[in-house]
Design a protein with these regions (language model features):
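Active-site glycine-centered loops adjacent to acidic/histidine catalytic or metal-binding residues
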Residues: 122, 149
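Hydrophobic residues in beta-strands of the RecA-like P-loop NTPase core, especially within AAA+ ATPase
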Residues: 38, 120-121
Length: 149
């Protein structure tokens, strides 16, 4: 633990941005052939960070509301077949620009927590909310199971 804010322990690592974070996550969490789940479509920079580790990239169905929680549950797997993590951009997703709905965020966080699937929540555009408050992050819904970039 590096700091405590308002009674809640926060774990932080300083870095040069989310691209560097993705590279470090790939080097630590991905082994050759391990499964990594991503939205369809997903951020090209994430795929470029993950690819040198030679994972099996598996797409999770998505629609205008965000990632399909039922498909996430199926593709998460279990035991030796479990995915290493799911990579998500819930705010202004790149390349689609969509924002995951509150209901879908709750469902995705619940599935991830239930099956023990780590979530990589990339939020590079989270400060672009001008006319409304931002939705609650996936990390706020599943703090022990989410790496927040």
């Amino acid at each position: 633990m590096i700091c405590e804010v308002r009674g809640q322990r926060l774990h932080h690592a300083a870095g040069a941005g989310s691209q560097q974070g993705l590279d470090l996550i790939a080097k630590v969490l991905i082994d050759e052939g391990s499964r990594v789940l991503v939205e369809t479509p997903t951020y090209l920079g994430a795929l470029q960070a993950f690819s040198p580790m030679e994972p099996e990239i598996v797409s999770v169905a998505s629609d205008d509301e965000g990632v399909d929680a039922a498909d996430l549950r199926i593709k998460a797997g279990s035991g030796a077949d479990a995915a290493r993590f799911v990579y998500l951009l819930p705010n202004f997703q790149n390349p689609t620009g969509r924002t995951m709905t509150e209901a879908r965020r709750a469902a995705v966080a619940a599935v991830a927590a239930e099956v023990g699937l780590p979530v990589i929540e990339d939020n590079p555009y989270g400060d672009l909310w001008f006319d409304a408050p931002p939705p609650a992050s996936l990390a706020s819904r599943n703090p022990e199971g989410t790496l927040y970039l």
